[in-house]
Swiss-Prot record:
HAMAP family: Ribosomal_bL35 (MF_00514). It holds the Pfam family Ribosomal_L35p. The gene is rpmI. One of its GO terms (biological process) is translation. One of its GO terms (molecular function) is structural constituent of ribosome. The keyword Ribosomal protein applies. Residues 10-44 have a biased composition (Basic residues). One of its GO terms (cellular component) is cytosolic large ribosomal subunit. This is Large ribosomal subunit protein bL35. Belongs to the bacterial ribosomal protein bL35 family. Keywords: Ribonucleoprotein, Ribosomal protein.
Length: 65
């Protein structure tokens, strides 16, 4: 059986935690930041946790993480 391919786009965006969950950075924080509130930008710095419904898809996309 051949090796499964890792989805490279997903591999660059998601990290797996020690407990097996996935985390990623928030969107909307690369440009056009002047109109966004400081509190909103500060909260966007935090890591975003992936919901359980989407974790199964990531398991298939990232078989070796």
């Amino acid at each position: 059986m051949p090796k499964m391919k890792t989805n490279r786009a997903a591999a660059k965006r998601f990290r797996k935690t020690a407990s097996g969950k996935y985390k990623a950075g928030h969107a909307n924080r690369s440009h056009i930041l002047t109109k966004k509130a400081t509190k909103r930008k500060r909260n966007l710095r935090q890591q975003n946790h992936v919901r359980a419904e989407d974790a199964g898809r990531l398991d298939r996309m990232l078989p070796y993480l």
